Amino acid sequence: MKHELSALKPLFILLPLLVLGFVLFWTLFGGTLSKDFQFKSAPSEQFTQEEIQGAADVALRRFKYGFSGCTMTKLQYVDAYASSDTWNWAAEYNADEGVVFHSTFTTDDFFAPKNGFNPNDTYAYQWYVARSNGGHWKIVNLGQG
């Protein structure tokens, strides 16, 4: 039994180091916001500014941890695309409320191509964020448009 535990000792040392390395990598090399980043939000008939900010935070978090080599310059809430009685797109994702953000980001020449983006380019991206019963926001769709 003692011999089996000593054989696992390198694993107990290596595993935390790998986890730490992974966390540091995504912290240092994840998506970033530009120095002149702008978040634009017009008044909404459906959502408070706090609700819009909460949904925006979900999109920004996804950008931070999923878009290494990219720098976001703008994120804008578009009230006209919010899920509504006349166009309830959120229902397609089993949700009852949804908001849409338009963003612009640039890519670098090292990390971005590894994520499928052209190097040194600018992208317009949409983020569809939805929730049910006033619960937590989640991204249900995203992409160029």
What are these regions (language model features)?
Residues 3-16, 20-113, 117-121:
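Flexible low-complexity loop/turn motifs enriched in small/helix-breaking residues
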Residues 122-145:
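Short beta-strand edge/turn micro-motifs at domain boundaries
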